[in-house]
Swiss-Prot record:
GO terms for molecular function: acylphosphatase activity. This is Acylphosphatase. It is an enzyme of class 3 (hydrolase). The keyword Cell division does not apply. The active site is at R18, N36. Its EC number is 3.6.1.7. Pfam families: Acylphosphatase (PF00708). The lineage of its organism: Bacteria, Bacillati, Bacillota, Bacilli, Lactobacillales. The gene is acyP. Belongs to the acylphosphatase family. It catalyses: an acyl phosphate + H2O = a carboxylate + phosphate + H(+). Keywords: Hydrolase.
Amino acid sequence: MKAIEVDVFGLVQGVGFRWFAQRTAQQHNIVGWVSNQTDGSVKIHAQGSQSDLIDFLSVLEKGPGFYSRVDKVITTNIPLFETNDFAIRG
């Protein structure tokens, strides 16, 4: 089990990215949360197996579709945390 913080930059607000991240997390057995940031980025705390996290990130980097654009993804290891779902926050 591993936990990461993911900062996603680009055109990722107002394009369904948080919903896309939640759906993708659920499909890859990832728990945690996603939130819009004031600088226009999206922050994700994600926890799961190493292979599930790799698969999750590879889908996230593509974005939800035509109206979104992912320019940069920064991933940082963080301590494991307690949750059993993947939530959309503010």
